[in-house]
Every structure is written in structure tokens, then in C-alpha cells.
Amino acid sequence: MKVTINGKEYSFRDGETILELAKRNGIFIPSLCQFEPLGHKPATCRVCLVEIMDKNGKRMAAACETPLSDGMVIDSISRHVRDMQRTQVELIFADHDQDCVSCVRHGDCELQDLGESVGLSRNRFTSKLPQKPQGRTLDETANGMTRDMSKCIRCLRCVEVCRKIQGVAALTLDGKGTDASIGVGMADDHATSACIQCGQCIMVCPTGALAEKDENDIVIDMLSDPEITTVFAFAPSVRVVLGEEFGLAPGVNVEGKIVGALKAIGADIVLDTDFAADAVIMEEGTELLHNIKHGGKLPMFTSCCPGWVNYAEKHFPEILPHVSTTRSPQAVLGALAKSYLTDAMEIDPGRVRVISIMPCVAKKDEAKRPELARNGVPDTDVVITVREFARLLRRFGINLSDVDPEPFDNPFMSSSTGAAVIFGSTGGVMEAAVRTVHAILTGRELDTIEVAPLRGMEDVKEAEIDLGPENGRIKVAICHGLRNAQKLAEDALAGKSPYAFIEVMACPGGCVDGGGTSRIKKKYHPHAKTRQQALYRMDRSMPRRQSHNNPQIRKMYGDYLGEPGSHKAHDLLHTCYSSRKKVPSQTIEK
């Protein structure tokens, strides 16, 4: 079967569209709404117009949705076709907020790229319409992200990823024609909707319609206040993602450069969230052992991912008794920085501000949970994403590539293990927990410290762990992408789960591809495996690879907390949850 494109003959596959064949053969046809990684082709933007001749005659058609037929003749480059494509782009711009310089996506926008690709030098319609579309929603009610519908081009990618990957279906298409916009279902606003603020919609949005809530000015205010002691910390995955924002290859470890950059902008203390990850394993592992030995709720689910916690509270509150009460590493670090650290360093905790650099949008929401505050004062004051941190450094004129590496600051909360590093990958929390739980129960380390069945990008993975003759074997599971968590939660509630412990990460690939990480236009997590492998290499290079072997963790428990699971540890390092159910539980198919 053959067709002709711009005078040249090509063979095509059964069911293939014009745009798919063109891409496969390196023929450029401008497009916007189509998103190949998700198989998404709603044909709403109509930019990929081509002229076709087939048995039905000559006509214009959208290349993304038009299937090929034998003998079809396609024109994508004539003056007439180019004019039609350009006109369509002009109309999209005319219905779009054109204050580009203030947009978070300025210079990294697919719509701007599209204007260049069709040769748009002047918009005939701009002077005839308001520069900013009227009556469009600007919703800033959510803690982690903003929705500006004046910048929405109705590509429906956000609706697709929310439904197809996350199974949340918080976003809907409301209205018709030019009055159509993306809404939040029956909710009054974003904050009260079914959205779990994972940020995966931001990762696929081609414009600035969806974005993290920028808090860099708050950070700069803290840095400039001489009465404040700023404590910065960053997550495991940040060190293998941030470099991409400054032109470095995916997976390059820039840990030392991050510390150096933070010192350059005036940070007083730089800690490692990896330390807190080791503390999480000590608490979560102790909690799991208690549940196994004393008939507690099984399976126990991890609690590190705030997107998952939001999902559990809003969609499956019945599962909350199964969710570990151990705080996330971010929340653990914030609590310890304003108690253990301030005591050890003789600092007034009232003047300490904790700034957390995360790969995650939902972490912003987590930091504002009232359960993670003491006397109304949040343990973590500000959370900025990888993208925000890159913008912050640029505001200080810093190129990370040029920064000399520096070590973490103090001897109290800066040591970590390989187990903490792999928290950044799906399966990492479970693998770290298995390493420590096995050692506590058997008195010896795992024969093979790397638990291969828990690694990789499969939606759901499981492993069987031998805990010695007295304790037998347990099955554990991990999943990433919340649609995959639905079945595991349903089985647990029905008493059908064969697992003792289940790790859930909201974002595909885990934190290395969180909603606050670097975006690659028209791609969806293309560097997940590269970033994961970088974390695994770091794990292998660490002198200690089990959380219980971290000397600073041992010192903290010996000097301050007592033992894992102690009353003081529970007061500082554990939390609680409550139902915020918005919609009936539902299984959303692929």
C-alpha cells in the first residue's frame, strides 16, 4: 500500500495516519494538540491541515486523525496549505493570552515554537480582539499549582493524562467552541476538586495554562532577611534531574553543585533530605514489623508520596488505616530541622525557615497540611520544584554548570546511605525498607542487597522476601501511576491482597519524573530510565547502603529520639490522615 506526499511515494502500514507516516519518514507537518507518547490525537487545534486527493475527491483534512488509503495524494507544503496552517495558528494566538514575557513557559512554549514553524511574523487578528481573552478562569486556590485558562489551547492532554495515567479524572472539558475550557468537574474550585496535585498535567501542557505555584519571591525574602536562618534541603532525585535545566546530560549527579549554588545565593545551612529518607526507613520499617508481629493492618502502604496520600484521602479513604503513619522525608526533615538540629546547634527555632527543593508539585500541598505544623507553624516553610529552583538560580545570574561543588554543611543531618538515594526511583522505598527489615529480623544483611524484581518501569512489580526461619516469607509489591494503585487498594479493602507491604508512587517512574521536574516538549518522561540508573549507580558507590548503618541516624536516635517508634519519634516523625472524599471510588480503564 502506497501514498504520495509532496510528490514522493511512501509505503504505509495498515491503520496509520498521515501524521504518523510523515513523522516516521522525517516529513514535518506542524501540529499542537497531538501527543504521541499517550496516543492522544483529539484533532482540536486543526493546525496539521493538509490537502488530500483520494477516491472522495480533493479536500483539506487534519493529518493527525486522517487514516491513509492506497493511492492517496497528500500535499503538506504548497502555498495554499501553508496559508491555511498559518491562519489556524493565528486564530489560536488570537484566542490566547499573548503576554508571553510574564508566562512561566516563555521561551519553552510549544505554541511559540508553532508560530515560528509556520512562519508567523504578524497576526492579522490580534488587533481586532483583546490581548487577554475575557472571562477565562484563573484559579490559584490549590496549594501547589495554578490554572490559567486564558492560556489554554484546549488540546485536552491534561484531561487525557489525568484519566489514562492517573485514573483520577479530575479534569473535564466544559462548554463548546470558543467558550470551551478545562474545568474541575463539579467542584467550586481547584482546591476543593478531586485533583491530587501530582502535576502530571503540567508535564504535558504545551503552554503555561497549568503551572506550579511559584514561590521564589518568598525564598528571596527569606534569604535577604538577616534575622532568619535559612535551612535548605533537596530530595534524592533532584541531584540527577536539575542539571538538565542547565544543558547537562540527563542523569548527571550535580549534588555538590547544588550545595555550591545554594551557598552562592546566601543559604545559611544546606542539609540532605536523604538523611531524612534513612530516618523514614527506620520508622516505617519498625511500623511494618509491629503490624506483622502483632496483627496490625496489612498490607501496609507507604506514605512518602503526597500525591498518593491525597489520592487515598480523596478517592479511597477506606484505605487510610492501611497507610503508614510515618511522615515523608520532606516532613521528617522539616520537623527535625526545627527541633533536633536547632537544639544541637543552639539556634532559635523561631528564626529558622526550612526551604525544600523537590521534584514534586504535591509536596507544596503537603507542606501546608495542618498535621505537619507545630503550634500553627509549618515544619517546612516553602517548597520549590526543580523548575522553580532553576529559575531562582537564573535570577541570581548563576549557571549551575559553572558552579564549583561543595559538601553539605553540618555533622548532624547530612550523612546518608545508598538506601536513601534510591528513594527517587519507583521501587526504591520498598527496596530500602527490605534491606533494613531483613537485617533487623535476621541479624544479617541481605545476601543480594539489590532487589532486582523491584526495579524497572513495569506498572506493578512484586517480590518475595525471606525473613528467616522464624518469620517466614512475605510478598511485597510496588506500583507507579495512580491508575495502577486502584486495583491494589481495592484488593486490600476486599481482603484479597497477598502482600504485606505495598509502595505507591503517583508519578510514572517515581520522583525522577515528578510533576515538578524538567519538561521535554512533546515528550513524556523520556529520561526516566537514565535518571533511575544514575540513582542506582550512586547507591552502588556509597560506603553504606542500608539506612540502619547511617552513623548520623544512630547518633540521632541515641542522643535525641531514643529508639525507632518511641513516643518522641512518634510525636515528631509520624502523622495522621482524614477522609476528604470527593467522588465515588471508581476503576478507570486504560
Regions from the language model: what does each represent?
Residues Q166, C205, L341-M345:
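Structural motif corresponding to the C-terminal cap of alpha-helices
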Residues M1-K2:
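Extreme N-terminal starter segment of soluble prokaryotic enzymes
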Residues D14-I77, V81, F93, K213-K590:
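Iron-sulfur-associated redox domains of electron-transfer enzymes in respiratory
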Residues R46-Q197, M203, L210-T229:
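Fe-S ferredoxin-like electron-transfer domains
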Residues S11, T141, K151, A194, ...:
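Charged, low-complexity surface patches
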Residues S11, R154, F301:
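Conserved SAM-binding loop
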